[in-house]
Amino acid sequence: MEGAWDVAFVLLHVWMSIVAGLIVLPAMFGVSLGFTDIYIKLLVKTLEWATLRIQRGQKEQPTLPLQLANGIIEKDDGSMEEEIVELRRSHPKNLAEGNFTLCDAFYFCKKGIENIVEDQVTQRFSSEELASWNLLTRTNNNFRYISVRLTIIWGLGVFVRYCVLLPLRITLAVIGLSWLVIGTTLVGFLPNSKVKNWLSDLVHITCYRICARGLSATIRYHNKENRPKKGGICVANHTSPIDIVILANDGCYAMVGQVHGGLMGVIQRSMVRSCPHVWFERSEMKDRHAVAKRLKDHISDKTKLPILIFPEGTCINNTSVMMFKKGSFEFGGTIYPVAIKYDPRFGDAFWNSAKYNMVSYILRMMTSWAIVCNVWYLPPMTQQDGEDAVHFANRVKSAIAHQGGLVDLSWDGGLKRSKVKESFKEEQQKMYSSMIVGLDSHEATVGPA
């Protein structure tokens, strides 16, 4: 029995030495030994081969259902006025004359049926479906047996992900999070000074780099000259808590976010000991006022870290950008927009908080192939003369969506948890009524107020 324990101890010692020497230490100094790059290149070749084999199998087996991309129906992208004009072609009339035709009803019937089948909102809160299988059963709805070789490759992938990568990633996650909790707690006892701020930044960025290695993260940063400066506000589209790890690998931030429980709550409480992060309860009005005051004080001090905010207020599945809350744009500071786009071939980064708790989500990430993403730093933006916070937020959101290749939606991500506001319905009613009574349709506005 003692011999077995000795062998186990030796194996553990060898394992930790390899992890520390080849991964943890290089990560702490921001150095890559190239293992992840080689792994990603090999993975790309494997997935390309699997895609070709699946396509050939679909030709050989006509009954095999084709993989569906995100979206199951094709919709017109035109405005209400454009689509109704198209319907009225058989009865050409001038909209400005205030005429009504019965065929107008077909437009609303069509839109209603489209939204019953597939609306623009709820599909943003579920995982993105892939056009081609990435050898993960969780991302393939229509998989059937195609060939022995493909099945063997899938089996080898399961072994690699669960028997090799998962233990390695759990080890790195434990090291990284332990470093964060212990390090921030110790730094928190120091008096406020430049040394404390430097140590806090060191603890945070080291933790994020180790955790990124634990996800086999490959991150490409573009336009680094536009990185957020101290005293500014960094806003980004939000897909998952991993967004923080991705951005903080390239610089430190003071963060603003919703209070969480469980593992996430432990991490939040430890982080705030050494750095002025702002955690709040969304349902508490007094918390909102306190957050607003702290944000104003923060951005007025040009020596403090840039604030990282996700104005959508919830996680979206990285296919679109939803409405930005105006609160982040009411302080008159410089906004540094950042677009984050994940490559879904290697793993689904979206956190469906209604379906998975934090631990379950992390395990899903650790059993994925890798996290591959692009980060674009956009030029800083400021509020223009005569521009209110709502229009400023929409302008920033559009810039992020355009750069990241995401769909720009005006809908509120809060619909994930609440019902549609009456104002949404009223805006559509106002637009149509302005058409049939002959008013200038541009007087009506579309989207949430």
Curated annotation (Swiss-Prot):
CDD domains: LPLAT_LPCAT1-like. It is a multi-pass membrane protein. Pathway: Glycerolipid metabolism; triacylglycerol biosynthesis; Phospholipid metabolism; CDP-diacylglycerol biosynthesis; CDP-diacylglycerol from sn-glycerol 3-phosphate: step 1/3. SUPFAM superfamilies: Glycerol-3-phosphate (1)-acyltransferase. Keywords: Acyltransferase, Endoplasmic reticulum, Lipid biosynthesis, Lipid metabolism, Membrane, Phospholipid biosynthesis, Phospholipid metabolism, Transferase, Transmembrane, Transmembrane helix. One of its GO terms (molecular function) is 1-acylglycerol-3-phosphate O-acyltransferase activity. Its EC number is 2.3.1.15, 2.3.1.51. This is Glycerol-3-phosphate acyltransferase 3. It comes from Danio rerio (Zebrafish).
